Amino acid sequence: MTVDSALRSPMMHSPSTKDVKALRFIEEMTRNVDFVQKKVIREILSRNSDTEYLKRFGLKGFTDRKTFKTKVPVVIYDDLKPEIQRIANGDRSMILSSYPITEFLTSSGTSAGERKLMPTIDEDMDRRQLLYSLLMPVMNLYVPGLDKGKALYFLFVKTESKTPGGLPARPVLTSYYKSEQFKRRPNDPYNVYTSPNEAILCPDSSQSMYTQMLCGLLMRHEVLRLGAVFASGLLRAIGFLQTNWKELADDISTGTLSSRISDPAIKESMSKILTKPDQELADFITSVCGQDNSWEGIITKIWPNTKYLDVIVTGAMAQYIPMLEYYSGGLPMACTMYASSESYFGINLKPMCKPSEVSYTIMPNMAYFEFLPHHEVPTEKSELVELADVEVGKEYELVITTYAGLNRYRVGDILQVTGFYNSAPQFKFVRRKNVLLSIESDKTDEAELQSAVENASLLLGEQGTRVIEYTSYAETKTIPGHYVIYWELLVKDQTNPPNDEVMARCCLEMEESLNSVYRQSRVADKSIGPLEIRVVKNGTFEELMDYAISRGASINQYKVPRCVSFTPIMELLDSRVVSTHFSPALPHWSPERRR
């Protein structure tokens, strides 16, 4: 087998001609990383040489990396906000890009609830489409026969807004699903969805979810893979099924669509799918989903031919792995690509690996990439590293320059180099930068907080209780301040929930899991008070998501913020608290442990 033995031969079955073309492209890109990067930055600087932004820094037509890096500063969003606001307000001069900005892609919500607007040009859609076209050729090397069935993917759009200057402002996936490239995509047996476009494109997420779930049930034997953008989205779909299975079964039993569906386009499309009663299927759903039955393994019970789950379970999404394993009966979870509102970055060349082993290979044609070494103690001036020159084992913050006019922009993702494929580095997503809890000199990042929650939740295992969702904030109104962690629990035995003693031990276990600076502040400095866990009612985090969506967040991109500070969110959480628990003792700390 050619094409470097089909990406070094995972299963050794022959790829199709179309797949071979895609695999050869991957080989070409990954063997010539530095050459491609030089070409990309030369193209970007040549095209955008007359922009106001690049003229400001005196590039004078130079297109080499050295001049660019010497003259153009590394920036964050706030540095570009004046230029972005001018474009949003209708200024059509060449501010950031020589090509017209056709829309803004909005970032997912932050703890403060503010959206960022990322400028986009028409041809960016082609770059995204190119990356999408590489996913199935790689997956086909590992999972044969995906052309013999369909994908049940829960995909959603959000009603877009307009900037004062009339440009669309919408999440990247809404932009993609509404594009002609998606709506008029050619027939591909490897990418057949159970959901009709009309359901995906419906702005009412409830009608969309209901229709997509109904289609998935009607075609349950054809489904070979289930997915959503994030792991939390797939769990939300399972939760929807738990709440609405009776109504769904009624539709199947009668062969008629629920009155909850009012969208004309959905009704028209479903008239061709829900064509007749199917009592046998309705009875099956009732028997499987009935309240007396366990929902463990529900995915494979309903969709028995499912080969894997297609969801992102890296970074903050890793905490959902146990719940997905529970509902799926241990199906593999595939993380296929790495992308953001700023740009699409790369793909996972081993998509069926364990979630803890996921690494993404950056495709050097997508943008110009630089890497800021990430230090525990920041240095005053760190030299940025080229894509081809990063070192295995080191952590970097991703910095990008895009065709649409982001120049040396700090994305905020912290990545660790895990190895190389040809000359292309492979990265593990570590965390978002500055997602922290801090009372004093302590700094707790997202990865540490997640690890602490996981360790503490092990104490609940004997009773079959799980932490299904969490967030946090730094309570500074008390003296001293302390960490507050909100937990939503799935209690197996409602007559025997975890008592205060168990929950207090969870508080202490979390503190034991935090870094030495935190423990020193607790023990020696007395500058941090006991950690507090507030247990909230079931459904609270669904309400939190609904609130975020009502304020403009995308259902596709929504992620539970792991640290909150926005007052209405805090008030919502506190209004749902059913019990509070504090750490009963000091965590262990000694000067010898400070490193």
Curated annotation (Swiss-Prot):
It holds the Pfam family GH3. The keyword Protein biosynthesis does not apply. Belongs to the IAA-amido conjugating enzyme family. Keywords: Ligase. Catalyzes the synthesis of indole-3-acetic acid (IAA)-amino acid conjugates, providing a mechanism for the plant to cope with the presence of excess auxin. Strongly reactive with Glu, Gln, Trp, Asp, Ala, Leu, Phe, Gly, Tyr, Met, Ile and Val. Little or no product formation with His, Ser, Thr, Arg, Lys, or Cys. Also active on pyruvic and butyric acid analogs of IAA, PAA and the synthetic auxin naphthaleneacetic acid (NAA). The two chlorinated synthetic auxin herbicides 2,4-D and 3,6-dichloro-o-anisic acid (dicamba) cannot be used as substrates. PANTHER family: GH3 DOMAIN-CONTAINING PROTEIN, INDOLE-3-ACETIC ACID-AMIDO SYNTHETASE GH3.3. Disulfide bonds: none annotated. GO terms for molecular function: indole-3-acetic acid amido synthetase activity. Its EC number is 6.3.2.-. Induction: By auxin. This is Indole-3-acetic acid-amido synthetase GH3.3. InterPro entries: GH3, GH3_C, GH3_M. It comes from Arabidopsis thaliana.
